[in-house]
C-alpha cells in the first residue's frame, strides 16, 4: 500500500516535563494551531483533549501517555503527551523507548525541577534528541536566562537559545528568532492564531547580536565548510544555520532552547517549526538493532524501510471497554496490515492482527496498513506483553525491551464481599499486565493480597480504576514501605535434598557460592563441568533460587542484588527430577544467605521543598528529624529550595505536616533515588514486627 506521508516527513515526539510545567497545555495549543481541535481544551477546566481519563480530568494531571497525530508544514507529527508526576514514570519510560525526539517543557519560574532531571536521564538512556521550551514566561519571577543556566548546570547539557524573549512576566509579548533575525509578537484577539513578524526592536539589538554570535559559533562546528565560510567573514544563510542546528541536535551535541507562554497562546507555532526543523525523522536516527532469539550472539539490523521484514515493539497495553485489548506498538522496519499473522519473538507464539487503529487520545481512526516509523494500536494480540517484539516469522528478532522501575510502596487489599473476590483477582491481573510498574503478590503468612507501585497516588488511581472500570469494591490497608533484603559478604552452601518414602524418592545436591551484586540485581552463573549435574536440572535450580528470593529470610521481603554461582553437585539416576532440584535450589540459597550477613534495605527518596524564607528553619529541622540528609539549597525569589534525601518510611503524612508548618505556603515533590541499608536499631524493630 502506498505511503501517504514520506518517512522523512514524519516526526515521532514526546512532550515531557515536571508536573505543572505546562506539557498538556502546550499539547492542547499544538492541536488547536494544527487544526486537530477547533477549540482549546484547558487542563484546569478538566477539558484537555489529551487528559481523557475521568481521574485525569478530576485531578488536572496526566496519568497515562496519550497519543495523537497532527500535521504541520506538510509533516506528520505523532505526539505522545506524558505524565509529569513521578508515580507514573513508567509511562515516560515506555514512551521515550519508542520516540525519535522530545520536547522538554520547563516552568520559567521554577526552572529545572526533580522530575525534569528524571525524564532527562531517561531520555539520555535511550539517546533521544530533544529541544527545550521554557514555558510560562508571563509568570511573576520568570527568567529565561536562569532557566537556560539551570539546564546547563543541573542537566549537564549544552543549551543553545535559538530565541530571545521580548519582555518577561506581565510584559512578555513575543520572541526574537535568532536564526531569521525577526521579532514575532502574538495577537491576543485571535488566541495567537495570527502573529506579527517585524524587525528586532532597537533595545534588544545588542543582546540579539551577542546571542546570535554564540549560537552560530556553537552550531557551525557541525560542518567544516560552513565553519570556514563563517570564519572567513561570510554571512551564513538561514537554511545553512537551520541545517547546522538540526545536525547538532540529532547528534545530541546541543539542545536548542525556545520560549513562550502556552496558556497565553504565545510561542507555540515557532515551537512546531522547531519540531519539524530540528528533531529527527525515523530515518535520521540510528537503525534499530536486535538479536536472533535462537542465536543471541547474532545481531540483526532493522532498517527503517517498509520493504524490510517486520520488526515492531509493543510498548503499552490497554483495555478499551468497547474494543477490548489494545497493543500499542512502534514499527521499526517493515509494515503491518489488518489480518496478517505475526510472530511474538519473546514467546515464540504466532498471532493474528485483527484491526489497526491510529489513536487520538481516546478517539480512534481505523486504518488498514501502517509502515516503518509508525506508532499504532493493534487489536487482536492476546498474548503480547509490554516490551515484546512482534516480527516476521521468517526473520525472528528480539528488540531491546524497557527498563521497568521497582515499586517502592505497597498496600494490602481485600474484596469487600465474597462476590468481589474473583472479580478483584481478574481486575488486578489485567491492570498489572497494562502497567509493568504495578505489581500484585500474595503474602503467604497473612493470606493477604499486596499491591505495590511507585507511590501513594499511583496506588490511589489503581484502586479508583477498580471501582470505576471493573465495578469491584475493595478495602485497602495503610501504605507500607516496600523494603528489600540483600547480603553484605560472600557465602557458600553445600545442600542435599534427599527424600525416601517408598517408591521413587527425591534426590538433589547442589553447591552454590553467592556474593553481593550491588545495583545489578540477580545474576546466575552455571560453572558445572563434567556433567555432575545434568543440563536439564540447571534451570530448575535457578528457578528454585529465584522463587526463594521473593521472600527473604529476615522479614520476608524480596532479596535483591545477589550473584549466584553453581559450582558443584551430584544426582541420582532414579530419584533425581526437576522438582527435586527445584527444592534443592530453594534450600541452598536460604542456607547461603544465612551465612552472608543479610541486611534490610529501605527506599531513599529525593525530596525538594520550596518554602518561603521565614519558614526555612522549621522545614530544615523537620527534615533532619525525618533522618533526612540535605544535599543542597538554592535561593529563589522570596523563597528557598531545599534538596534532601529522606527515607520513604519517614515521608508518610509529610504533605499535611508541611502545610501546617508553613500555613500552606510551601510545596514539595519527591521521587525514588536508591535503596540504602536500614539502621541497625530500626532493622531490629522491623524484623521483630514481621516475626
Swiss-Prot record:
Gene3D superfamilies xref list: 3.30.230.10, 3.30.70.240, Elongation Factor G (Translational Gtpase), domain 3 (3.30.70.870), P-loop containing nucleotide triphosphate hydrolases (3.40.50.300), Translation factors (2.40.30.10)
SUPFAM superfamilies: EF-G C-terminal domain-like (SSF54980), P-loop containing nucleoside triphosphate hydrolases (SSF52540), Ribosomal protein S5 domain 2-like (SSF54211), Translation proteins (SSF50447)
GO biological process, one term: ribosome disassembly
Residues passing through the membrane, by range: none
InterPro entries: EF-G-like_DII, EFG_II, EFG_III, EFG_III/V, EFG_IV, EFG_V, EFG_V-like, G_TR_CS
Keyword Cytoplasm: yes
Entry's localization field: Cytoplasm
UniProt GO MF annotations: GTP binding; GTPase activity; translation elongation factor activity
Major place of residence: cytoplasm
Domain of life, source organism: Bacteria
Coiled-coil segments on the chain, per record: none
Annotated GTP binding sites: 17-24, 81-85, 135-138
SMART domains the record matches: EFG_C (SM00838), EFG_IV (SM00889)
Presence of the UniProt keyword Membrane in the record: no
Positions of the tr-type G domain: 8-283
Function per UniProt: Catalyzes the GTP-dependent ribosomal translocation step during translation elongation. During this step, the ribosome changes from the pre-translocational (PRE) to the post-translocational (POST) state as the newly formed A-site-bound peptidyl-tRNA and P-site-bound deacylated tRNA move to the P and E sites, respectively. Catalyzes the coordinated movement of the two tRNA molecules, the mRNA and conformational changes in the ribosome.
Family: Belongs to the TRAFAC class translation factor GTPase superfamily. Classic translation factor GTPase family. EF-G/EF-2 subfamily.
HAMAP family in UniProt: EF_G_EF_2_B
Protein name: Elongation factor G
